[in-house]
Swiss-Prot record:
KW Cell wall biogenesis/degradation (keyword) present: yes
One GO CC term, this protein: plasma membrane
EC number(s) on file: 2.7.8.13
Cellular compartments annotated: Cell inner membrane
Membrane disposition: Multi-pass membrane protein
Family per similarity comment: Belongs to the glycosyltransferase 4 family. MraY subfamily.
Top-rank EC class of the record's enzyme: transferase
Name of the gene: mraY
Function statement: Catalyzes the initial step of the lipid cycle reactions in the biosynthesis of the cell wall peptidoglycan: transfers peptidoglycan precursor phospho-MurNAc-pentapeptide from UDP-MurNAc-pentapeptide onto the lipid carrier undecaprenyl phosphate, yielding undecaprenyl-pyrophosphoryl-MurNAc-pentapeptide, known as lipid I.
Alphabetical list of HAMAP family matching this protein: MraY
Cofactor: Mg(2+)
Chemical reaction(s) catalysed: UDP-N-acetyl-alpha-D-muramoyl-L-alanyl-gamma-D-glutamyl-meso-2,6-diaminopimeloyl-D-alanyl-D-alanine + di-trans,octa-cis-undecaprenyl phosphate = di-trans,octa-cis-undecaprenyl diphospho-N-acetyl-alpha-D-muramoyl-L-alanyl-D-glutamyl-meso-2,6-diaminopimeloyl-D-alanyl-D-alanine + UMP
Protein name (record): Phospho-N-acetylmuramoyl-pentapeptide-transferase
Protein backbone atom coordinates (compact mmCIF):
# COMPACT_ATOMS: atom_id res chain seq x y z
CA UNK A 1 0.00 0.00 0.00
CA UNK A 2 2.70 2.49 1.02
CA UNK A 3 4.83 1.39 -1.94
CA UNK A 4 2.02 2.20 -4.33
CA UNK A 5 1.50 5.58 -2.63
CA UNK A 6 5.22 6.36 -2.72
CA UNK A 7 5.35 5.67 -6.47
CA UNK A 8 2.78 8.41 -6.97
CA UNK A 9 4.52 10.86 -4.62
CA UNK A 10 8.10 10.38 -5.83
CA UNK A 11 7.58 12.92 -8.60
CA UNK A 12 6.99 15.55 -5.91
CA UNK A 13 9.84 14.48 -3.62
CA UNK A 14 12.63 12.12 -4.68
CA UNK A 15 13.09 10.88 -1.09
CA UNK A 16 10.03 8.67 -1.53
CA UNK A 17 12.15 6.55 -3.86
CA UNK A 18 13.53 4.78 -0.77
CA UNK A 19 10.26 2.81 -0.65
CA UNK A 20 11.27 1.03 -3.85
CA UNK A 21 14.31 -0.57 -2.19
CA UNK A 22 13.64 -4.13 -1.07
CA UNK A 23 16.17 -4.02 1.77
CA UNK A 24 14.58 -0.90 3.26
CA UNK A 25 11.09 -2.36 3.08
CA UNK A 26 12.30 -5.64 4.58
CA UNK A 27 13.72 -3.84 7.61
CA UNK A 28 10.66 -1.67 8.20
CA UNK A 29 8.38 -4.66 7.62
CA UNK A 30 10.16 -6.49 10.44
CA UNK A 31 10.02 -3.46 12.73
CA UNK A 32 6.36 -2.77 11.94
CA UNK A 33 5.32 -6.33 12.75
CA UNK A 34 7.49 -6.30 15.88
CA UNK A 35 5.97 -3.08 17.24
CA UNK A 36 2.41 -4.16 16.42
CA UNK A 37 3.00 -7.43 18.26
CA UNK A 38 4.52 -5.68 21.27
CA UNK A 39 1.69 -3.13 21.35
CA UNK A 40 -1.04 -5.76 21.05
CA UNK A 41 0.49 -8.16 23.58
CA UNK A 42 -0.66 -6.66 26.91
CA UNK A 43 -4.04 -5.73 25.47
CA UNK A 44 -4.57 -9.17 23.95
CA UNK A 45 -3.55 -10.94 27.16
CA UNK A 46 -5.90 -8.80 29.26
CA UNK A 47 -8.76 -9.38 26.82
CA UNK A 48 -8.23 -13.14 26.71
CA UNK A 49 -8.11 -13.28 30.51
CA UNK A 50 -11.35 -11.31 30.72
CA UNK A 51 -13.02 -13.74 28.32
CA UNK A 52 -11.57 -16.70 30.27
CA UNK A 53 -9.93 -18.02 27.10
CA UNK A 54 -7.45 -20.16 29.03
CA UNK A 55 -5.37 -23.11 27.94
CA UNK A 56 -6.93 -26.54 28.38
CA UNK A 57 -4.30 -29.00 29.65
CA UNK A 58 -4.59 -32.77 29.20
CA UNK A 59 -4.71 -34.78 32.42
CA UNK A 60 -2.33 -37.39 30.96
CA UNK A 61 0.36 -34.82 30.17
CA UNK A 62 3.48 -33.97 32.20
CA UNK A 63 2.63 -32.81 35.72
CA UNK A 64 4.70 -29.65 35.21
CA UNK A 65 2.10 -28.53 32.65
CA UNK A 66 -0.77 -28.48 35.13
CA UNK A 67 0.33 -25.03 36.27
CA UNK A 68 -0.21 -23.79 32.70
CA UNK A 69 -3.93 -24.49 32.94
CA UNK A 70 -5.82 -21.24 32.45
CA UNK A 71 -2.95 -19.36 30.78
CA UNK A 72 -4.48 -17.22 27.99
CA UNK A 73 -4.37 -18.89 24.58
CA UNK A 74 -5.25 -17.81 21.02
CA UNK A 75 -2.41 -15.29 21.15
CA UNK A 76 -1.71 -16.22 17.55
CA UNK A 77 -4.30 -13.59 16.64
CA UNK A 78 -1.75 -10.89 17.42
CA UNK A 79 0.89 -12.67 15.32
CA UNK A 80 -1.43 -12.87 12.32
CA UNK A 81 -2.57 -9.28 12.73
CA UNK A 82 1.01 -8.02 12.87
CA UNK A 83 2.04 -10.02 9.80
CA UNK A 84 -0.96 -9.10 7.67
CA UNK A 85 -0.82 -5.38 8.49
CA UNK A 86 2.93 -5.20 7.91
CA UNK A 87 2.75 -7.08 4.61
CA UNK A 88 -0.14 -4.97 3.32
CA UNK A 89 1.77 -1.81 4.21
CA UNK A 90 5.18 -2.69 2.76
CA UNK A 91 4.76 -5.31 0.01
CA UNK A 92 3.72 -4.60 -3.58
CA UNK A 93 -0.05 -5.24 -3.60
CA UNK A 94 0.09 -6.59 -7.16
CA UNK A 95 2.48 -9.44 -6.32
CA UNK A 96 0.69 -12.82 -6.63
CA UNK A 97 3.14 -14.66 -4.36
CA UNK A 98 2.33 -12.33 -1.49
CA UNK A 99 -1.37 -13.03 -1.84
CA UNK A 100 -0.79 -16.79 -1.97
CA UNK A 101 0.94 -16.63 1.41
CA UNK A 102 -1.76 -14.39 2.89
CA UNK A 103 -4.53 -16.73 1.71
CA UNK A 104 -2.90 -19.73 3.41
CA UNK A 105 -1.92 -17.73 6.50
CA UNK A 106 -5.40 -16.30 7.09
CA UNK A 107 -7.22 -19.45 5.96
CA UNK A 108 -5.28 -21.70 8.31
CA UNK A 109 -5.60 -19.08 11.00
CA UNK A 110 -9.39 -19.24 10.74
CA UNK A 111 -9.30 -23.05 10.99
CA UNK A 112 -7.08 -22.77 14.05
CA UNK A 113 -9.35 -20.14 15.57
CA UNK A 114 -12.38 -22.43 15.30
CA UNK A 115 -10.33 -25.27 16.82
CA UNK A 116 -9.17 -23.08 19.72
CA UNK A 117 -12.64 -21.68 20.30
CA UNK A 118 -14.09 -25.15 20.74
CA UNK A 119 -11.32 -26.00 23.19
CA UNK A 120 -11.53 -22.91 25.39
CA UNK A 121 -15.30 -22.30 25.30
CA UNK A 122 -16.54 -25.89 25.30
CA UNK A 123 -13.56 -27.10 27.35
CA UNK A 124 -13.03 -29.83 24.76
CA UNK A 125 -9.33 -30.79 24.55
CA UNK A 126 -9.92 -32.34 21.09
CA UNK A 127 -11.22 -29.11 19.56
CA UNK A 128 -12.39 -29.18 15.96
CA UNK A 129 -13.14 -32.69 14.69
CA UNK A 130 -9.98 -33.93 12.95
CA UNK A 131 -11.63 -34.86 9.66
CA UNK A 132 -13.12 -31.38 9.29
CA UNK A 133 -9.84 -29.73 10.20
CA UNK A 134 -7.96 -31.71 7.55
CA UNK A 135 -10.75 -31.21 5.02
CA UNK A 136 -10.57 -27.41 5.18
CA UNK A 137 -6.78 -27.41 5.35
CA UNK A 138 -6.78 -29.59 2.23
CA UNK A 139 -9.24 -27.34 0.40
CA UNK A 140 -7.05 -24.30 0.96
CA UNK A 141 -3.79 -26.10 0.14
CA UNK A 142 -5.12 -27.76 -3.02
CA UNK A 143 -6.80 -24.55 -4.17
CA UNK A 144 -3.61 -22.51 -3.91
CA UNK A 145 -1.43 -25.32 -5.31
CA UNK A 146 -3.65 -25.88 -8.35
CA UNK A 147 -3.83 -22.14 -9.07
CA UNK A 148 -0.03 -21.94 -8.95
CA UNK A 149 0.26 -24.96 -11.24
CA UNK A 150 -2.05 -23.45 -13.85
CA UNK A 151 -0.15 -20.16 -13.70
CA UNK A 152 3.33 -21.64 -13.87
CA UNK A 153 3.32 -25.09 -15.51
CA UNK A 154 6.28 -25.83 -17.78
CA UNK A 155 8.26 -22.99 -16.17
CA UNK A 156 10.89 -22.90 -13.40
CA UNK A 157 7.98 -22.29 -11.01
CA UNK A 158 7.16 -26.02 -11.11
CA UNK A 159 10.70 -27.41 -11.02
CA UNK A 160 11.99 -29.36 -8.04
CA UNK A 161 15.26 -28.09 -6.59
CA UNK A 162 17.37 -30.94 -5.16
CA UNK A 163 20.05 -30.04 -2.59
CA UNK A 164 23.70 -30.73 -3.52
CA UNK A 165 22.85 -31.30 -7.21
CA UNK A 166 22.86 -28.08 -9.23
CA UNK A 167 21.83 -29.71 -12.51
CA UNK A 168 19.04 -31.88 -11.10
CA UNK A 169 15.80 -29.91 -11.41
CA UNK A 170 13.06 -32.21 -12.69
CA UNK A 171 9.89 -30.69 -14.07
CA UNK A 172 7.10 -31.96 -11.79
CA UNK A 173 4.09 -31.30 -13.95
CA UNK A 174 0.85 -32.20 -12.19
CA UNK A 175 2.80 -33.83 -9.34
CA UNK A 176 3.62 -30.27 -8.31
CA UNK A 177 0.08 -29.95 -6.94
CA UNK A 178 0.44 -33.12 -4.86
CA UNK A 179 3.83 -32.08 -3.49
CA UNK A 180 2.60 -28.60 -2.65
CA UNK A 181 -0.41 -30.06 -0.86
CA UNK A 182 1.69 -32.31 1.39
CA UNK A 183 4.21 -29.56 2.13
CA UNK A 184 1.59 -26.98 3.12
CA UNK A 185 -0.64 -29.30 5.15
CA UNK A 186 2.31 -31.18 6.61
CA UNK A 187 4.15 -28.07 7.75
CA UNK A 188 0.99 -26.62 9.27
CA UNK A 189 0.53 -29.73 11.38
CA UNK A 190 4.24 -30.03 12.18
CA UNK A 191 4.43 -26.55 13.71
CA UNK A 192 1.20 -27.28 15.55
CA UNK A 193 2.72 -30.42 17.11
CA UNK A 194 5.87 -28.51 18.08
CA UNK A 195 3.90 -25.85 19.95
CA UNK A 196 3.89 -27.69 23.26
CA UNK A 197 6.35 -25.72 25.40
CA UNK A 198 6.79 -22.01 26.10
CA UNK A 199 8.46 -20.45 23.07
CA UNK A 200 9.38 -23.81 21.55
CA UNK A 201 7.58 -23.34 18.21
CA UNK A 202 7.93 -19.61 17.66
CA UNK A 203 11.72 -19.33 17.68
CA UNK A 204 12.36 -22.10 15.10
CA UNK A 205 9.64 -20.43 13.02
CA UNK A 206 11.55 -17.14 13.25
CA UNK A 207 14.81 -18.86 12.28
CA UNK A 208 13.27 -20.62 9.27
CA UNK A 209 11.49 -17.45 8.12
CA UNK A 210 14.77 -15.51 8.36
CA UNK A 211 16.48 -18.21 6.31
CA UNK A 212 13.76 -18.09 3.67
CA UNK A 213 14.06 -14.29 3.55
CA UNK A 214 17.64 -14.73 2.30
CA UNK A 215 16.58 -17.45 -0.14
CA UNK A 216 13.72 -15.31 -1.46
CA UNK A 217 16.09 -12.40 -2.03
CA UNK A 218 18.49 -14.61 -3.99
CA UNK A 219 15.68 -16.30 -5.96
CA UNK A 220 14.25 -12.94 -7.00
CA UNK A 221 17.66 -11.64 -8.11
CA UNK A 222 18.67 -13.00 -11.51
CA UNK A 223 22.42 -12.68 -10.91
CA UNK A 224 22.37 -14.47 -7.56
CA UNK A 225 19.91 -17.10 -8.77
CA UNK A 226 22.19 -17.95 -11.67
CA UNK A 227 25.24 -17.93 -9.39
CA UNK A 228 23.61 -20.37 -6.95
CA UNK A 229 22.03 -22.44 -9.74
CA UNK A 230 18.52 -22.03 -8.37
CA UNK A 231 15.44 -21.03 -10.41
CA UNK A 232 15.05 -17.31 -10.98
CA UNK A 233 11.48 -16.31 -10.09
CA UNK A 234 10.72 -12.65 -10.68
CA UNK A 235 7.93 -12.48 -8.10
CA UNK A 236 9.97 -14.13 -5.35
CA UNK A 237 11.68 -10.97 -4.09
CA UNK A 238 8.54 -9.70 -2.39
CA UNK A 239 8.47 -12.81 -0.21
CA UNK A 240 11.35 -11.19 1.66
CA UNK A 241 8.80 -8.72 3.03
CA UNK A 242 6.52 -11.56 4.13
CA UNK A 243 9.37 -13.45 5.79
CA UNK A 244 10.68 -10.43 7.68
CA UNK A 245 7.13 -9.67 8.84
CA UNK A 246 6.95 -13.21 10.25
CA UNK A 247 10.30 -12.66 11.99
CA UNK A 248 9.15 -9.38 13.54
CA UNK A 249 5.76 -10.69 14.63
CA UNK A 250 7.38 -13.82 16.03
CA UNK A 251 9.93 -11.91 18.09
CA UNK A 252 7.21 -9.63 19.42
CA UNK A 253 5.12 -12.64 20.43
CA UNK A 254 8.13 -14.32 22.05
CA UNK A 255 8.35 -11.35 24.43
CA UNK A 256 5.16 -12.65 26.05
CA UNK A 257 5.51 -16.35 25.22
CA UNK A 258 8.96 -16.95 26.70
CA UNK A 259 9.15 -19.17 29.79
CA UNK A 260 7.04 -18.85 31.89
CA UNK A 261 4.56 -17.92 29.18
CA UNK A 262 1.99 -15.18 29.66
CA UNK A 263 0.13 -16.31 26.55
CA UNK A 264 0.09 -19.23 24.10
CA UNK A 265 -0.34 -18.86 20.36
CA UNK A 266 -2.88 -21.68 20.09
CA UNK A 267 -3.79 -23.41 16.84
CA UNK A 268 -4.76 -20.05 15.35
CA UNK A 269 -1.06 -19.21 15.41
CA UNK A 270 0.68 -22.55 14.90
CA UNK A 271 -1.43 -23.78 11.98
CA UNK A 272 -1.19 -20.39 10.26
CA UNK A 273 2.57 -20.03 10.70
CA UNK A 274 3.21 -23.60 9.61
CA UNK A 275 1.03 -23.19 6.55
CA UNK A 276 2.80 -19.93 5.70
CA UNK A 277 6.24 -21.56 5.89
CA UNK A 278 4.96 -24.40 3.73
CA UNK A 279 3.61 -22.19 0.95
CA UNK A 280 6.75 -20.02 1.03
CA UNK A 281 8.87 -23.15 0.49
CA UNK A 282 6.60 -24.19 -2.38
CA UNK A 283 6.74 -20.77 -4.03
CA UNK A 284 10.54 -20.67 -3.79
CA UNK A 285 10.82 -24.29 -5.03
CA UNK A 286 12.73 -25.16 -1.85
CA UNK A 287 10.69 -27.97 -0.34
CA UNK A 288 13.81 -30.01 0.45
CA UNK A 289 15.40 -26.98 2.05
CA UNK A 290 12.37 -26.67 4.34
CA UNK A 291 12.93 -30.25 5.51
CA UNK A 292 16.50 -29.32 6.48
CA UNK A 293 15.89 -25.89 8.00
CA UNK A 294 12.67 -27.00 9.65
CA UNK A 295 14.27 -30.18 10.98
CA UNK A 296 12.92 -29.58 14.48
CA UNK A 297 9.38 -29.63 13.10
CA UNK A 298 10.17 -32.77 11.09
CA UNK A 299 11.57 -34.64 14.11
CA UNK A 300 8.61 -33.63 16.28
CA UNK A 301 6.22 -34.99 13.66
CA UNK A 302 8.19 -38.20 13.08
CA UNK A 303 8.25 -38.85 16.83
CA UNK A 304 4.44 -38.84 16.88
CA UNK A 305 4.19 -41.07 13.80
CA UNK A 306 6.72 -43.56 15.20
CA UNK A 307 5.08 -43.55 18.63
CA UNK A 308 1.60 -44.25 17.26
CA UNK A 309 2.87 -46.81 14.74
CA UNK A 310 4.96 -48.68 17.30
CA UNK A 311 2.11 -48.83 19.81
CA UNK A 312 -0.38 -50.12 17.24
CA UNK A 313 1.99 -52.70 15.72
CA UNK A 314 3.95 -53.87 18.77
CA UNK A 315 1.95 -52.60 21.71
CA UNK A 316 5.04 -50.73 22.90
CA UNK A 317 5.97 -47.06 22.95
CA UNK A 318 9.34 -45.82 21.71
CA UNK A 319 9.28 -42.59 23.70
CA UNK A 320 8.01 -41.88 27.16
CA UNK A 321 5.62 -39.44 25.52
CA UNK A 322 5.24 -37.82 22.10
CA UNK A 323 5.90 -35.31 20.62
CA UNK A 324 9.53 -35.78 21.54
CA UNK A 325 9.87 -32.60 23.61
CA UNK A 326 7.62 -34.24 26.22
CA UNK A 327 9.93 -37.27 26.22
CA UNK A 328 12.80 -35.11 27.41
CA UNK A 329 10.59 -33.45 30.01
CA UNK A 330 9.69 -36.85 31.44
CA UNK A 331 13.40 -37.74 31.48
CA UNK A 332 13.84 -34.93 33.96
CA UNK A 333 15.04 -32.09 31.74
CA UNK A 334 13.75 -28.69 32.94
CA UNK A 335 11.46 -27.07 30.40
CA UNK A 336 13.82 -24.13 29.65
CA UNK A 337 16.64 -26.60 28.86
CA UNK A 338 14.49 -28.45 26.34
CA UNK A 339 13.39 -25.21 24.72
CA UNK A 340 16.80 -23.57 24.38
CA UNK A 341 18.47 -26.75 23.11
CA UNK A 342 15.80 -27.13 20.47
CA UNK A 343 16.38 -23.48 19.52
CA UNK A 344 20.11 -24.12 19.13
CA UNK A 345 19.46 -27.17 16.96
CA UNK A 346 17.01 -25.16 14.85
CA UNK A 347 19.52 -22.35 14.27
CA UNK A 348 22.20 -24.87 13.29
CA UNK A 349 19.83 -26.56 10.82
CA UNK A 350 18.93 -23.25 9.19
CA UNK A 351 22.62 -22.43 8.71
CA UNK A 352 23.25 -25.91 7.30
CA UNK A 353 20.28 -25.49 4.97
CA UNK A 354 21.58 -22.17 3.68
CA UNK A 355 25.00 -23.73 3.15
CA UNK A 356 23.47 -26.36 0.85
CA UNK A 357 22.61 -23.60 -1.61
CA UNK A 358 26.31 -23.14 -2.26
CA UNK A 359 27.54 -26.72 -1.75
CA UNK A 360 26.20 -28.04 -5.05
Amino acid sequence: MLVWLAEHLVKYYSGFNVFSYLTFRAIVSLLTALFISLWMGPRMIARLQKLSFGQVVRNDGPESHFSKRGTPTMGGIMILTAIVVSVLLWAYPSNPYVWCVLVVLVGYGIIGFVDDYRKVVRKDTKGLIARWKYFWMSVIALGVAFALYLAGKDTPATELVVPFFKDVMPQLGLFYVLLAYFVIVGTGNAVNLTDGLDGLAIMPTVFVAAGFALVAWATGNMNFANYLHIPYLRHAGELVIVCTAIVGAGLGFLWFNTYPAQVFMGDVGSLALGGALGIIAVLLRQEFLLVIMGGVFVVETLSVILQVGSFKLRGQRIFRMAPIHHHYELKGWPEPRVIVRFWIISLMLVLIGLATLKVR
